[in-house]
Amino acid sequence: MQTVVITGGTDGLGRGLAVHYLRQGARVVAVGSTPAKGKALLAEAAAVSAADRAVFLRADLTSVAAAEELVTTIETTCPSVDKLVLCAQRYRLFGPRTVTSEGFEHSFALAYLSRYVLSHGLRKALESAPRPVIMNVGTPGVPLGRIHWDDPQLTHGYSGTKATLQSFRANDLLGVAFAALYADSPVSHVGYNPGVVSTDMPNHLPAPLRVLTKAAFALLATSVTKAVAPMVRLLDEPPGERCTAYRSSRRLPLKGPAFDQDAALRLHHLTQDLVTGAKP
Ligand SMILES: NC(=O)c1ccc[n+]([C@@H]2O[C@H](COP(=O)([O-])OP(=O)(O)OC[C@H]3O[C@@H](n4cnc5c(N)ncnc54)[C@H](OP(=O)(O)O)[C@@H]3O)[C@@H](O)[C@H]2O)c1
């Protein structure tokens, strides 16, 4: 039986994938921070006769310690992991800079560090599966944002947009570094941009932007059911190359600073130091 681990598996795209794989007979481990959402997913699993294959793990992935604890829990309860899907995200485009209890800027911690810890931490469990794949869901192919090498925690000149875009670019580099570091690993790392998808995401935005985003979503957004279909195809038939990027079904060239190998390895080493010390 396949094991599919999905962060953000209790809502939006992650939930869509969780329900799909439960229906397909896989064991699904869904991670989220809200117990009520986990309970609702388990109820849906029971409704499709998959209660014995559905697991909800509550974790606040803004915390490196929580992400590491999650790795340990998954390693000790799952003999192998076939698919790791990284969807946990909460945009903070406005408002003041906030810092986690471990001292990291919020977007850096949730949208990037947790994905770094889970990708590297679960590598061995993934390598025990026949066709392992990591799908890192974000915005590859969007030419915005950069790594602020001299101040990645954005202690100076912070803006929520800057932090969010930095976390996206960091995830592009995470895939490149992963492939460079483990060239002989069978794990396929897919950076994935789903396009505009109608999820709960706008409800977490501040009021004026929420209204605008919802209006734009009503015109432009794909449903979760439709958006999940090309994701499933890639997850079930991962590309042969170790690192790839897609926007929906379209393969993206790994060109430009977002996919630069030197920058990727530089960020890897910087992150390794941060995670080891668990402080910026
Ligand atoms: N929707 C789009 O149009 C779109 C476009 C481009 C890229 N994406 C990317 O697709 C991915 C999924 O987005 P979505 O729209 O499906 O999001 P969503 O509907 O808002 O779901 C986000 C998920 O992340 C979890 N989460 C948030 N904060 C967390 C925390 N601190 N710890 C653990 N889990 C946490 C949420 O669970 P809790 O609420 O329980 O914490 C929820 O399950 C994201 O990476 C996003 O950047 C989405």
Model-assigned labels for residue ranges:
Residues S185-V187, G191, V211-D273, G277:
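C-terminal helical subdomain
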Residues E69-T76, G95, E102-A109:
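Active-site Tyr-X3-Lys motif and surrounding loop/helix of classical short-chain dehydrogenase/reductase
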Residues M1-V29, S33:
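Canonical Rossmann dinucleotide-binding motif of NAD(H)/NADP(H)-dependent dehydrogenases/reductases
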Residues S119-H120, V176:
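A short, exposed helix-loop element centered on a Lys and neighboring polar residues
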Residues T7, P79-Q89, M135-G138, V190:
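Rossmann-fold scaffold of SDR-type NAD(P)-dependent oxidoreductases
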Residues R90-R97, E105-F108, E127-P186, N193-P208, ...:
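Catalytic loop of short-chain dehydrogenase/reductase
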